[in-house]
């Protein structure tokens, strides 16, 4: 029991800064929406539309680079720290290549925006302008993620938290300057949010790079050889590990976007109730997602040390802590669901629907916690292909079709409306949780030599 208690302390010490960093990131999006809304409703809508395209594109790159964390954690655990700098260099090369692709996609996103049904031309122009300003921040964001993954792979999660809050503090005044046109800058409205956010990502990257260069604990792994050429073997391995994570993230984000589109014709009350429940559950998702990042670090580190039993302990502890957190947040959601809904909207119909959906969200949180921590465990074991196949099957083969059937057809029961999609979420996430656990069990039952050989690749 003592080893689980000790492991839980170490996991929480890693996870809490990640949680706070994620809060800062979420707050940046909230600040952009509020400040753009203060300028005009059209500008706020433009930021919302632009963000809905930015997120799938940038999260694809973000997911690709997540491969660095278990690689660095494993090298750190095995005492091969001299190889970390080379892995990080290749991470920067990969981030550079991916950022070019992301920028090309975002530059041409105007075709998607202008093809939206009945979109106002002025709104479309502002959304395109917002994206074309924001895309210059894509390299800064991805380079920052490489530096952050280096720190987190070395079990240092506090720098990411500090840089997250630095970004938030810089974002507010820079937003103000470019939205309203102060200090000789042009008045850009919602487009100014894109300029500010792009600038903030570069500030966060430069600050993180400065920390890495001056941190005593990283003296032995600094890049003293210059940038060097791309190493095709290392980059291929990072892509093999990262691509399944990137695709899983992409399909998860697009699933919720597709459901939002399918709910939109059902009416304002249904859309608002669905959005409130989804927004609140996404805030709660920060907890297990951050814990999953900590579990990846601990499992990778323990495998690097050559201890498959300690890696199992880290995995089981992460699941136990995650389930406890999910039960607490589920009870909180059920108990205060009406009060939470009233914080978003005071329309009685919207509040009633949101409160009903939050009952389903409480169940969803438990399944979601297990599946996301399961994904973190599999990343630690460098078993990333299974993450993609499990999430794709669970979300797109099981979750979305069953949600569609329950919500919009009479095939099984009378049309359930938004609640049907939430039942689909529960089916999809519960399936993912079960499949992740089965895969984890299969991996852990393999001989130690095979597990360690896979981890050392």
From Swiss-Prot:
GO biological process: sodium ion transport; xenobiotic transmembrane transport
Disulfide bond annotation, renumbered to this chain: none
Pfam families: MatE
Membrane topology: Multi-pass membrane protein
Compartments reported by the entry: Cell inner membrane
Alphabetical keyword list: Antiport, Cell inner membrane, Cell membrane, Ion transport, Membrane, Sodium, Sodium transport, Transmembrane, Transmembrane helix, Transport
Alphabetized GO MF terms: antiporter activity; xenobiotic transmembrane transporter activity
Highest taxon of the lineage: Bacteria
Transmembrane parts of this sequence: 11-31, 53-73, 93-113, 127-147, 160-180, 188-208, 243-263, 276-296, 314-334, 350-370, 387-407, 418-438
GO cellular component labels: plasma membrane
Main location: membrane
HAMAP family: MdtK (MF_00400)
Role summary: Multidrug efflux pump that functions probably as a Na(+)/drug antiporter.
Family: Belongs to the multi antimicrobial extrusion (MATE) (TC 2.A.66.1) family. MdtK subfamily.
Protein name according to UniProt: Multidrug resistance protein MdtK
Originating organism: Salmonella enteritidis PT4 (strain P125109)
Taxonomic placement: Bacteria, Pseudomonadati, Pseudomonadota, Gammaproteobacteria, Enterobacterales
Gene name linked to the record: mdtK
């Amino acid at each position: 029991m003592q080893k689980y208690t000790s492991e839980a302390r170490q996991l929480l010490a890693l996870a809490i800064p990640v949680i706070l960093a994620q809060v800062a990131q979420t707050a940046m999006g909230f600040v952009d929406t509020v400040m753009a809304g203060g300028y005009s409703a059209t500008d706020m809508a433009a930021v919302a539309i632009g963000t809905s395209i930015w997120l799938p594109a940038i999260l694809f790159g973000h997911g690709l680079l997540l491969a660095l964390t278990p690689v660095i954690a494993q090298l750190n655990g095995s005492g091969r720290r001299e190889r970390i700098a080379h892995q990080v260099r290749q991470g920067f090369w990969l981030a550079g290549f991916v950022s070019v692709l992301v920028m090309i996609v975002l530059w041409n996103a105007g075709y998607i925006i202008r093809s939206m049904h009945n979109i106002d031309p002025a709104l479309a122009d502002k959304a395109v302008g917002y994206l074309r300003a924001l895309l210059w921040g894509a390299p800064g964001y991805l380079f920052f993620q490489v530096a952050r993954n280096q720190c987190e792979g070395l079990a240092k999660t506090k720098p990411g938290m500090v840089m997250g809050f630095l970004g938030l503090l810089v974002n507010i005044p820079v937003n103000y300057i470019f939205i309203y046109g102060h200090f000789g800058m042009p008045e850009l409205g919602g487009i100014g949010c894109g300029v500010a956010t792009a600038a903030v990502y570069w500030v966060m990257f430069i600050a993180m790079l400065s920390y890495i260069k001056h941190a005593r604990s990283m003296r032995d792994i600094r890049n003293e050889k210059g940038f060097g050429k791309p190493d095709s073997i290392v980059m291929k391995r990072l892509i093999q590990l990262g691509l399944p994570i990137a695709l899983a993230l992409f399909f998860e984000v697009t699933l919720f976007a597709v459901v939002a589109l399918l709910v939109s014709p059902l009416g304002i009350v249904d859309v608002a109730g669905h959005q409130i429940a989804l927004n609140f559950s996404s805030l709660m998702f920060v907890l297990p997602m951050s814990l999953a990042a900590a579990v990846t670090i601990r499992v990778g580190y323990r495998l690097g040390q050559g201890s498959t039993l300690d890696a199992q302990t880290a995995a089981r502890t992460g699941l136990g802590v995650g389930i406890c957190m999910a039960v607490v947040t589920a009870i909180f959601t059920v108990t205060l669901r009406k009060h939470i809904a009233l914080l978003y909207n005071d329309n009685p119909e919207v509040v009633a629907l949101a409160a009903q959906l939050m009952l389903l969200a409480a169940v969803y949180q438990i399944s979601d916690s297990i599946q996301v921590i399961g994904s973190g465990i599999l990343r630690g074991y460098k078993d990333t292909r299974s993450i993609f196949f499990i999430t794709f099957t669970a979300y797109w083969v099981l979750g979305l079709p069953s949600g569609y059937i329950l919500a919009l057809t009479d095939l099984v029961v009378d049309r359930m409306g938004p609640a049907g999609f939430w039942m689909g979420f529960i089916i999809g996430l519960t399936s993912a949780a079960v499949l992740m656990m089965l895969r984890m069990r299969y991996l852990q039952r393999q001989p130690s030599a095979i597990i360690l050989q896979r981890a050392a690749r």
